[in-house]
UniProtKB/Swiss-Prot annotation:
Keywords: Isoprene biosynthesis, Magnesium, Metal-binding, Thiamine biosynthesis, Thiamine pyrophosphate, Transferase. The lineage of its organism: Bacteria, Bacillati, Bacillota, Bacilli, Bacillales. Belongs to the transketolase family. DXPS subfamily. GO terms for molecular function: 1-deoxy-D-xylulose-5-phosphate synthase activity; magnesium ion binding; thiamine pyrophosphate binding. Catalyzes the acyloin condensation reaction between C atoms 2 and 3 of pyruvate and glyceraldehyde 3-phosphate to yield 1-deoxy-D-xylulose-5-phosphate (DXP). It comes from Shouchella clausii (strain KSM-K16). PROSITE patterns: TRANSKETOLASE_1, TRANSKETOLASE_2. Thiamine diphosphate binds at H72, G113, H114, S115, G145, A146, N173, Y284, E366. This is 1-deoxy-D-xylulose-5-phosphate synthase. Pathway: Metabolic intermediate biosynthesis; 1-deoxy-D-xylulose 5-phosphate biosynthesis; 1-deoxy-D-xylulose 5-phosphate from D-glyceraldehyde 3-phosphate and pyruvate: step 1/1.
Length: 628
């Protein structure tokens, strides 16, 4: 079938299972080919092809609401809702979003990117449906990894209590990004072997209803019998105790079984959970054999061999992080690492190879990870909480209440700080400076290169005056020479990278090389600009700021973070409190959510380019010269 001719899923209504199986094969071939060029979340999508086909055949989207938790498994849904022609632009600038997007299609009723939100969203939609008196089905599709998130468990508890009719499809592939951890994962493991329970329960009801005269009445009061059967055959039916009707486990690649159970779920009153077992990466051998999560999401790859297409370059910041942490941990047994389900992305899997008892993957539990780090710190340990900037948002109260308020020595290693590119607006790491710098006791640092980064990590672990956050980007380092030994850096003291007398740039991190290119252009035009590495975002270098004000230099702050409440705002606040008058402009991320694209394209969009920096400075300098 030509998938690019699909307009909407209505054509599936009359498809036989044989036709659906042929379509599933076409979809898998399409995804493997297209994603080899663009990259993307191939593993999750290959695993849900039959499930997505069954859902769209049995339900009437967009009247019936399909909510895809996290959303990285929604590519098949996008194909069936008319977006196959756009797959050449997947995750590219102004192209097809890698997650559900309400402005992209009426079939995308719930936007995602972070995990564990679909059940709460579904509960809200089901409540609105009942208040309005309509009858649409609400279906949330959530993975076994996302189900371990605290918000999902909160929603399960409320849904079970309210007994709203909605369907939860648990897509259980035994992996999220990395292999799942925790007690709930163990419960699901037991349920995977409990198919006999569902069959026995259905058979029991059928037998009871066949009893002359009394059968119907007995069937209506058979819950205690079924409960006894449940405890006889399955150790702890977690979901039924939460108030759900549990159906499964179902083979997620068996269309007959899938359609039977989903049809039963539609007819069942109250909340229903359909437990579907899928194979992540199904149909593509390299992805099927992945045991570490490497094929969860990828860049481009060679379709025939599965070999990843990698550009040579310096080590990545996460690799420098893990290797430096190992060096320090060899000398200090108090150093421990905590990650919320991102051991591979953060490279803490490298740390765990050497120190398996000192690395803790707590699952999708950013709040717990933050407070566990605080608890470790109270006992004299040196916890390093490694978390993506975008996911640190999910544990903000714990950073405030448990870490900063108690002034505990926790190092928060903020990975993916700044614009991350293809994952788009749900993953851009541009808010952490704004939401952290208002907190008492915290120190915020940001290195300009990988060499400064290793010294900064050492400084952070040695620091014993409270919490310290170190921000660093996703990509490769700059290729600078790495010092052999580690040393402590002064906190709250900036350094001048380039002297100048016409104006000064205050910036840090990834914006240093961008500013250097701007200064090269300005130098050719006859301007002499000072460049300052403001690597201590909090505290500021107050002595240097006072000296700059006394020189009456025009100042330009540049940051790869939001302007509102950011570094530039901190500099303005300082001068306001001191009553000092300076000519200052700020450059950074404007007040909107930045969508997907390459980082260089996004720099162009938000104005963080050498040309825009040079133009901004030139617009300031004539005013300065005129006053002189």
């Amino acid at each position: 079938m030509n998938l690019e001719e699909i307009q909407d899923p209505s054509f599936l209504k009359n498809y036989s299972n044989k036709q659906l199986e042929e379509l599933a094969a076409d979809i898998r071939r399409f995804l493997i080919e297209k994603l080899s060029a663009t990259g993307g979340h191939i593993g999750p999508n290959l695993g849900v092809v039959e499930l997505t086909l069954a859902l769209h055949q049995l339900f009437d989207s967009p009247k019936d609401k399909l909510l895809w938790d996290v959303g990285h498994q929604a590519y098949v849904h996008k194909i069936l809702t008319g977006r196959a022609p756009q797959f050449d632009t997947l995750r590219q600038y102004k192209g097809l979003c890698g997650f559900p997007k309400r402005t992209e299609s009426e079939h995308d009723v719930w936007e995602t990117g972070h995990s564990s939100t679909s059940l709460s969203g579904a509960m809200g939609m089901a409540t609105a449906r009942d208040l309005k008196g309509t009858n649409e089905n609400i279906v949330a599709i959530i993975g076994d990894g996302a189900l371990t998130g605290g918000m999902a468990l909160e929603a399960l508890n409320h849904i079970g209590h309210e007994q709203k009719h909605l369907i939860v499809v648990l897509n259980d592939n035994e992996m999220s990004i990395a292999p799942n951890v925790g007690a709930l994962h163990s419960i699901l493991g037991r349920l995977r072997t409990a198919g006999k329970y569902q069959k026995a329960k259905e058979d029991l009801e059928t037998i009871i209803r066949k009893i002359p005269a009394f059968g119907g009445k007995l069937a209506d009061t058979a819950e205690r019998l079924k409960d006894s059967l449940k405890y006889l055959m399955v150790s702890g039916m977690f979901f039924e105790e939460m108030g759900f009707t549990y159906l499964g486990p179902v083979d997620g690649h068996d269309l007959d079984d899938l359609k039977h159970q989903l049809s039963y779920a539609k007819k069942t009153s109250g909340p229903v959970l359909v437990h579907v077992l899928t194979k992540k990466g199904k149909g593509y051998k390299p992805a099927e054999e992945d045991a570490t999560g490497a094929w969860h999401g990828t860049g481009p790859y060679k379709m025939e061999s599965g070999e990843m297409v990698k550009k040579p370059g310096p080590p990545s910041y996460p690799s420098v992080f893990a290797n430096t942490l190992k060096r320090i941990a060899r000398e200090d047994e108090r150093v421990v690492a905590i990650t919320p389900a991102m051991p591979g992305g953060s490279k803490l899997d490298l740390f765990a190879e050497e120190f398996p008892d000192r690395m803790f993957d707590v699952g999708i539990a950013e709040q717990h990870a933050a407070t566990m780090s605080a608890g470790l710190a109270t006992q004299g340990m040196k916890p390093v909480y490694a978390v993506y900037s975008t996911f640190l948002q999910r544990g903000y109260d714990q950073v405030v209440h448990d870490i900063c308020r108690q002034n505990l020595n926790v190092l928060i290693a903020i990975d993916r700080a700044g614009l991350v590119g293809a994952d788009g607006e749900t993953h851009q790491g541009v808010f952490d400076i704004a939401f952290l710098r208002s907190l008492p006791n915290i120190t915020i640092l940001n290195p300009k290169d990988e060499n400064e980064f290793q010294h900064m990590l050492y400084t952070g672990i040695c620091y014993d005056d409270g919490p310290i956050a170190i921000r660093y980007p996703r990509g490769n380092g700059t290729g600078v020479k790495m010092d052999a030994s580690l040393s402590r850096l002064p906190i709250g003291k900036w350094n001048v990278l380039q002297e100048g007398t016409d104006a000064a740039i205050l910036t840090f991190g990834t914006m240093i090389p961008v500013a250097e290119k701007a200064l090269a252009q300005l130098k050719q035009a006859g301007y002499n600009i000072r460049l300052i590495n403001a690597n201590s975002v909090k505290p500021l270098d107050e002595k240097l700021l006072e000296a700059l004000a006394e020189e009456e230099l025009p100042l330009l702050t540049i940051e790869e973070s939001v302007l509102q409440g950011g570094f530039g705002s901190a500099v303005l606040e300082f001068y306001n409190e001191k009553g000092m008058h300076v000519e200052l402009k700020r450059m950074g991320i404007p007040d909107y959510f930045v969508e997907h694209g390459s980082v260089s394209e996004l720099y162009q969009e938000v104005g963080l380019t050498p040309e825009r920096i040079a133009d901004t400075l030139i617009s300031m300098l004539p005013q300065k010269r005129k006053r002189a």
